[in-house]
A protein has these predicted regions:
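Short, small-residue-biased leader/transition segments that mark boundaries at the very start
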Residues: 1-3, 114
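Hydrophobic packing residues in well-ordered alpha-helices of helical domains and bundles
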Residues: 5-9
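Rossmann-like NAD(P) dinucleotide-binding subdomain of oxidoreductase/dehydrogenase enzymes
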Residues: 12-15, 23-114
């Protein structure tokens, strides 16, 4: 695993964690009538699937995982068969950090047909 990939991955996780703290709702004025206020709410959309390539195995995974977790979504990552250890270590690090079971999963192959 390349140390630059690991350091970049840590920076990405930090950035999404900060962005996640700003996902509160807000009131905005209506375009047609300034007396009307509209509320913007940001809610999780549900489980997210991510398919990652072999190059930069940490960086490619954290870009997807960081965004999904910051938005409050659970995620299933289909890791690359060519570099299986990096995504597995990353998922384990999230588990060790206290991420609840079932929030982040990792698979490598789904039979012969990818679904």
């Amino acid at each position: 695993m390349c140390s630059s990939d690991l350091l970049a991955g840590a920076d990405i996780i930090d950035w999404f964690a900060e962005e996640g703290s700003r996902t509160y709702g807000r009131l905005v004025a209506s375009r047609g009538n300034l007396a009307i206020r509209q509320m913007v709410l940001k809610d999780p959309v549900g489980p997210v699937a991510a398919f990652t390539p072999w190059n930069f195995p940490i960086n490619q995974v954290v870009r997807k995982v960081g965004a999904a977790l910051a938005a409050g979504c659970s995620m299933l990552v289909k890791g690359p068969e060519e570099t299986p250890a990096s995504p597995a270590a990353l998922v384990q690090a999230f588990a060790d950090a206290g991420l609840p079971e079932g929030v982040l999963g990792l698979v490598y192959e789904i039979g012969r047909a990818h679904v």
